[in-house]
Amino acid sequence: MKKKMSIIMVLAMAAMMSPVLAQEVEVTSLTRLLEGVEGPAYFPVLNSAGDRLLFSSENGALKLYDFADNVTAVVTRDPVAGHDACFGGDGKIYFVTQQTGDDHLIYRTGHCYDALSREVTRLTEPHHGTVKAVATTRGGAMRAPGGADRSWASITGNGAWTEGNRVHVAVGGEERVFSPVDSWAGYLWASLSPDGKRVAFFAAGKGIVVIDLRGQVVAMLGNYEMPCWYDNDYLVAQHATDDGHQFTSSQIMLLKADGSWQAQLNSPESMAMHPTCGGGKIVYTTIDGLLYEMHINIYR
């Protein structure tokens, strides 16, 4: 009888707690962006204030949307520039273009775009090999990972990026390099938390990893992709499945940075992907290129 009563008490406590857990996050609004104005849009990137959005149009042009003015401007018509474009801490946009030379080799060139003057400045000469745009709290720089490991501009401020199976963390002008977990295909999508104390990144075969500034693993968040810091305590990420040929589902997840909690922000059938965060908002696209702006309320 005593054992039976204990089970009943446990079930009763679970029943009382479950509504609280279920309501820890609420989607308060979901708005389609640029409906009837832009066609399919991919690779969205919000700035930290959440008032500007980068995206690639169907024809590959990199575009900038200003939420306040409700205006879209073309940054460049290069078809690959939007794949890794980013906002620097100076407000400029850093991106890489790609060209085929007379020798039939592919060359990449780094640029930055000033949204106020609408001027593009070339930062590097065409380079055969990988060129990566790196955003920091004070601006941005261009990196050439691999054998030609180099920077074309000194990296100032704080930031994080990946090169192969290494995560690079810049803190106060000092660059630190870590390989905290084994990964058969390297790391991707590194970002620094808003308070500058932790770095989240994706490791192939491991999922999302959170480390401190000494490279020590503080949390493993699960098999999700494309992590983005929502605030110092939560990240937003993509959870996609495929059949080896195409996506079969994709949704946006909210993950607590210590790995203790997670929640679905939409259904797997929504085919939502590539989330980005800034200024308390979340923007994502769908497999069909539909942009959405989401707002949530987290009950802490």
Language-model segments: residues:
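Bacterial N-terminal signal peptides
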Residues: 8-16
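Sequence signature of WD/YWTD-type beta-propeller architectures
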Residues: 22-300
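Bacterial N-terminal signal peptides that target proteins for export
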Residues: 1-8
